[in-house]
């Protein structure tokens, strides 16, 4: 089922070494990029390389969008309860990996401990909590005078995030997209 697939993703993502990101997660599995171009991740505080990340190409984007479009056919039909379960599972895994996420933010951004843990990592967790709270109280279909308004997922969301607020911006964009029933390409 779709929930099983998403649980597999969340579990697989928890096994990723943060600074050795040479594969992309596309269509339920980690895959090699179309091109082999790698980019050094530099800690701005030390100016040292802390790992490498694969650079995506138009071919990688096409593969990811194609997979996300195919997944959208099913995820767009997930119930509100299923979407809540997905967000809660992500939140629980986020909590379990909190220290790892904070360490990754610290080294990737060269951020002080308080900023990485409190400003970045905690804020990401707060975005998940807010998305869950909003979704719990949201109705996707309601009467408006003589009309029925039905809110439906729009499709694949392309998420672009800055280097200086990485986890915060990922979560603040991903959580509402998942709550709405959309798929994402990050």
Annotate each language-model stretch with its function.
Residues 13-145:
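N-terminal Rossmann-like NAD(P)+-binding subdomain of aldehyde/semialdehyde dehydrogenases
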Residues 1-18:
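N-terminal amphipathic/basic-hydrophobic helices that include classical n-h-c signal peptides
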Residues 138-186:
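Conserved small-residue-rich beta-alpha loop and adjacent elements
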Residues 6-7, 58, 62, 147, ...:
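Hydrophobic residues within membrane-embedded alpha helices
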Residues 3, 27, 160-162:
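Intrinsically disordered regions, especially transient/low-confidence alpha-helical propensity segments
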């Amino acid at each position: 089922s779709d929930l099983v697939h998403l649980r597999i993703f969340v579990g697989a993502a928890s096994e990723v070494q943060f600074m050795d990101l040479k594969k992309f997660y596309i269509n339920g599995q980690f895959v090699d990029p179309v091109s082999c171009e790698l980019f050094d991740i530099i800690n701005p505080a030390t100016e040292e390389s802390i790992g490498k990340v694969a650079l995506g190409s138009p071919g990688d984007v096409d593969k990811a969008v194609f997979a996300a479009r195919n997944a959208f056919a099913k995820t767009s039909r997930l119930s509100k309860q299923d979407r809540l379960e997905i967000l809660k599972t992500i939140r629980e895994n986020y909590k379990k990996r909190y220290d790892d996420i904070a360490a990754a933010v610290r080294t990737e951004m060269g951020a002080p401990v308080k900023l990485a843990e409190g400003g970045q990592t905690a804020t990401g967790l707060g975005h998940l909590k807010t998305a869950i709270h909003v979704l719990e109280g949201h109705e996707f279909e309601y009467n408006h005078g003589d009309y029925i308004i039905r809110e439906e997922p729009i499709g694949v969301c392309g998420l672009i995030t800055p280097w200086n607020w990485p986890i915060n911006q990922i979560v603040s964009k991903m959580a509402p997209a998942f709550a709405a029933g959309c798929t994402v390409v990050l």
